[in-house]
Amino acid sequence: MLIAQRPSLTEEVVDEFRSRFVIEPLEPGFGYTLGNSLRRTLLSSIPGAAVTSIRVDGVLHEFTTVPGVKEDVTDLILNIKQLVVSSEHDEPVVMYLRKQGPGLVTAADIAPPAGVEVHNPDLVLATLNGKGKLEMELTVERGRGYVSAVQNKQVGQEIGRIPVDSIYSPVLKVTYKVEATRVEQRTDFDKLIVDVETKQAMRPRDAMASAGKTLVELFGLARELNIDAEGIDMGPSPVDAALAADLVMPIEELELTVRSYNCLKREGVHSVGELVARSEADLLDIRNFGAKSIDEVKAKLAGMGLGLKDSPPGFDPTAAALGADDDADAGFLETEHY
């Protein structure tokens, strides 16, 4: 059995809707194999929502104008295609827009139903004069990739229903590059960097997760031909190994104050793993272990990327700390670790 070092994936957040994902180390050649597959999947196969057709009051086709509206229907459709929407519905849903001039018509004027959200409300759709009035229905559907207005046209659709081009993909841009990285004495391993930029309807990490799920499903078809076939097995995760080492660490290595240390030892807490299994409420039940001790422990654990277990619902740490014996001398003066 061939065992390779398990790659790790880290995310560098550039802004709310752009991230760089680094996957390393990869066996030589796998950087381009994985990078190309991820890029194509991200650009073409991430589900999303878009407007598929509109119906404007008083309009029969797109090659006309609306009284009191500066933009003609063609320009109106071009603006509508820039709408960023998300929908929880598998079936088509309708949004409504009604606006009386004068003034601008923006995406914020659209009234979406429950389960549908417009993510760029500042988008300008049209300009109305003093006598202008715009009433419109916008049909939203879920899908993948790009679908033209011709494909969106339905047989026997009602008169005045105008199909529009639909860009379902929530991903705007994907680039990747492969660099060399070192593993022990070898310098020919691959480091894959994938830069993902999305619309406001989806975070880059969610798009990346969706692409990964799709690829796993597809490559699983080949695996099912012979589930016992030999391949390259990934070794243990370095993150898991580091976490395991932290959890077995004795609490002596946290370098707590004498009071906190002795309180924990009296309670039978000897390792970091036993400590993180306790909640703040559990620790405040320990005699002489109060708010200052809690803050000290939380700070030490945070430095390791760890934290205490969640307290029960309704737990009030402030009230609990006030009732604790923190820093009350009460004859409790210990100066040795034991």
UniProtKB/Swiss-Prot annotation:
Gene Ontology terms, MF aspect: DNA binding; DNA-directed RNA polymerase activity; protein dimerization activity
Protein EC: 2.7.7.6
Keywords: DNA-directed RNA polymerase, Nucleotidyltransferase, Transcription, Transferase
Any one Gene Ontology cellular component term annotated for this protein: DNA-directed RNA polymerase complex
Pfam families on file: RNA_pol_A_bac (PF01000), RNA_pol_A_CTD (PF03118), RNA_pol_L (PF01193)
SUPFAM superfamilies associated with the record: C-terminal domain of RNA polymerase alpha subunit (SSF47789), Insert subdomain of RNA polymerase alpha subunit (SSF56553), RBP11-like subunits of RNA polymerase (SSF55257)
Region (Alpha C-terminal domain (alpha-CTD)): 243-338
Region span, Alpha N-terminal domain (alpha-NTD): 1-226
Catalytic function, reaction form: RNA(n) + a ribonucleoside 5'-triphosphate = RNA(n+1) + diphosphate
GO biological process, one term: DNA-templated transcription
Membrane-traversing stretches: none
Superkingdom as given in the UniProt entry: Bacteria
Keyword Chloroplast: no
Subunit description: Homodimer. The RNAP catalytic core consists of 2 alpha, 1 beta, 1 beta' and 1 omega subunit. When a sigma factor is associated with the core the holoenzyme is formed, which can initiate transcription.
Purpose: DNA-dependent RNA polymerase catalyzes the transcription of DNA into RNA using the four ribonucleoside triphosphates as substrates.
NCBIfam families, A to Z: PRK05182.1-2, PRK05182.1-4, PRK05182.2-5, rpoA
Family: Belongs to the RNA polymerase alpha chain family.
Domain free text: The N-terminal domain is essential for RNAP assembly and basal transcription, whereas the C-terminal domain is involved in interaction with transcriptional regulators and with upstream promoter elements.
Protein name: DNA-directed RNA polymerase subunit alpha
